[in-house]
């Protein structure tokens, strides 16, 4: 079956199959081939950026970095001196410095792991829900927030799972609603 040419039906817009659109006059075969290659790589990059494993990895790395940064910032404002917790009294400045840096590193790793775990679970669940529903709306974030909150509170029992799910769903719904709202200059 062939598509009728626009000249046969002058009041209808031209309809072209994807990849068969006309190019400007004077376009060489080499330029057409380069354009098709660029479009192919653009589609590949779009597929990679929409893949669940990449989203989960980005959330994990970002969570690790943010958690470590928050821990580093809280260490600078700590009320308790880490040297007072030392089991043996450190005499040299070098030993004291090494102890403080090791303590900060341990805290940064612990906090970063927690943030990474939350980010990876939420991102993975939300990506699976989005793939199942084939939609990108606020309900994906709310339902993913509920499931993530329940998963993270699973060791504390069913009541804590329900409470964690509701709290995480409300938080993620509020953030998603704020991110999807129109910017101030468009109102």
Curated annotation (Swiss-Prot):
Disulfide cross-links: 52-127
Subcellular location: Mitochondrion inner membrane
CC annotations in GO: TIM22 mitochondrial import inner membrane insertion complex
GO biological process: protein insertion into mitochondrial inner membrane
Pfam families: Tim17
Assigned keywords, A-Z: Disulfide bond, Membrane, Mitochondrion, Mitochondrion inner membrane, Protein transport, Translocation, Transmembrane, Transmembrane helix, Transport
Main location: mitochondrion
TM annotation in the entry: 58-78, 138-154, 159-179
Database matches in InterPro entries: TIM22 (IPR039175)
GO molecular function term, any single one: protein transmembrane transporter activity
Protein's membrane topology: Multi-pass membrane protein
Assembly with partners or alone: Component of the TIM22 complex, whose core is composed of TIM22 and TIM54, associated with the 70 kDa heterohexamer composed of TIM9 and TIM10 (or TIM8 and TIM13).
Assigned protein family: Belongs to the Tim17/Tim22/Tim23 family.
PANTHER family in alphabetical order: MITOCHONDRIAL IMPORT INNER MEMBRANE TRANSLOCASE SUBUNIT TIM22
Function per UniProt: Essential core component of the TIM22 complex, a complex that mediates the import and insertion of multi-pass transmembrane proteins into the mitochondrial inner membrane. In the TIM22 complex, it constitutes the voltage-activated and signal-gated channel. Forms a twin-pore translocase that uses the membrane potential as external driving force in 2 voltage-dependent steps.
Stated name of the protein: Mitochondrial import inner membrane translocase subunit TIM22
Organism of derivation: Cryptococcus neoformans var. neoformans serotype D (strain JEC21 / ATCC MYA-565) (Filobasidiella neoformans)
UniProt gene name: TIM22
């Amino acid at each position: 079956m062939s598509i009728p040419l626009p000249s046969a039906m002058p009041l209808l817009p031209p309809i072209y199959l994807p990849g068969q659109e006309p190019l400007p006059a004077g376009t060489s075969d080499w330029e057409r081939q380069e354009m098709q290659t660029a479009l192919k790589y653009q589609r590949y990059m779009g597929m990679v950026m929409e893949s669940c494993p990449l989203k989960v990895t980005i959330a994990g790395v970002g969570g690790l970095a943010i958690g470590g940064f928050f821990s580093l910032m809280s260490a600078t404002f700590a009320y308790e001196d880490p040297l007072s917790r030392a089991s043996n009294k450190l005499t040299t400045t070098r030993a004291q410095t090494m102890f403080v840096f090791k303590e900060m590193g341990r805290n940064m790793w612990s906090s970063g792991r927690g943030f990474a775990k939350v980010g990876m679970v939420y991102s993975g669940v939300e990506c699976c829900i989005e793939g199942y529903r084939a939609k990108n709306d606020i309900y994906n974030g709310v339902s993913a927030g509920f499931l993530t909150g329940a998963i993270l509170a699973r060791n504390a029992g069913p009541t804590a799972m329900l409470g964690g799910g509701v709290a995480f769903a409300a938080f993620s719904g509020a953030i998603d609603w704020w991110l999807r709202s129109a910017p101030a200059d468009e109102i």
